[in-house]
Amino acid sequence: MKVQRSTFLAVTGKSNLHHFHSSSQRIPITSEIDSREFVSKLLDRKWGLQCPASPIQQISVSSVKGIDKFSFLNNTRPHLGDEMSKSKQGSSFYILRDDLLHPLVNGNKARKLDALLPLVEDHKVTDLVTCGGCQSAHTAAVAVSCAERGLRSHLLLRGEQPDVLTGYNLVSTMYGNVQYVPRSRYANREEMLRTYADLVAGEDGTVLWAKDIVEGRDTMNVAKMDDFSSMKTSRRKVLIVNEGAGDALALLGMFRLVQHLSQDHLLGKKRPVKFVVDAGTGTTAVGLGVAAMSLGLPWEINAVMLADTLKNYKRHEDHLIAEFSRQFPGSVFCSGLDMNQMIKWIDRQHPRKFGKVLEGEVEMCRKIAQETGVLVDPMYTLAAWETATELVQDEKSSIVVMLHTGGTLGMFGLAQRYKTCFTNLKD
């Protein structure tokens, strides 16, 4: 497994122990208690999810002869907290079932929207505009989440309408207002989103980007946002959310999750943990890393690169950190930890062009489902499962935890696209 280590860049370029980073000043944090207090204040807000918890299960891995190599067994009620070390026998990893957070919203999408949705309601947004691919889990999540709150969603999907609506595309169509956009026009996402948002808003409406309604905004945005909140109810208030919700605000949902998991009766604060997560845009992995760093946790994030190059993942990582520090000026960056060890960007076991399914992968997903009751998909979560399985073969000191980001509905789209892979399934 090829490993590439990331570098977290503090915005100031300097760091000693813990620091607050601000555009105007840098206030040193002298103790771990200070950093935890900052995180507590950061998370003292309204949330979209009623509770940050999702089920934690334990997957035992056994070597077998033949082409399958491994068999799996699921313990749906494992020992956690101090009991984890006592029950660690043989090869096993834990799986955080974020795929069970919502029947139609991917787990990682629910986390990314966790902090945004209450702000949308507080500022009386009437319409939300975003974009994604034809089978975008993000647009489906936005459509469902908006409909649940009585808001209108406008979804710009890349390419042409498929002959048969299924999977995330069907969910987006049922819950939101879908427009298919030619690839040439979609290439300039910012202009495309702004133009369509202006059309939705009309002459009397107002348009804002998601970053305009978060803390740390400048004076001009404050005035604009106040006007946005006080508008007459008859006027459209349109909010633009970037593709994939890959903004700094999305990191807050991961902060909330990490704080929850670091409780003593779950993973704890002192136990070494190797997290494994599939990386589409990489936002979830960065959120896990920054949150673990801020809380001083001895965790390592293994991000399996699926859709981009190492250079671009690192660029996105640096952008998110800079944006997060700008929007939340008290952001904590713990240089007491070796940041090169916080996130490891790694290749999946069988690299390929994104979107391609290799022979035998659908069969492996079926095997895992039948043996454990956990459904993974060959596009995303199978890659994380394979990496977690590989890690536990050699890992002795750390606990391995896979974050199941979801993707169940994606299987419907894949079954339509790769018909022979599914029709040839046999016992």
Curated annotation (Swiss-Prot):
Its cofactor is pyridoxal 5'-phosphate. GO terms for cellular component: mitochondrion. Keywords: Lyase, Mitochondrion, Pyridoxal phosphate, Transit peptide. Signal peptide: none annotated. It is found in: Mitochondrion. SUPFAM superfamilies: Tryptophan synthase beta subunit-like PLP-dependent enzymes. GO terms for biological process: cysteine catabolic process. Its main location: mitochondrion. It holds the Pfam family PALP. InterPro entries: ACCD_DCysDesulf, TrpB-like_PALP, TrpB-like_PALP_sf. It catalyses: D-cysteine + H2O = hydrogen sulfide + pyruvate + NH4(+) + H(+). Catalyzes the production of hydrogen sulfide (H2S) from cysteine. Can accept both D-cysteine and L-cysteine as substrate. Belongs to the ACC deaminase/D-cysteine desulfhydrase family. This is D-cysteine desulfhydrase 2, mitochondrial.
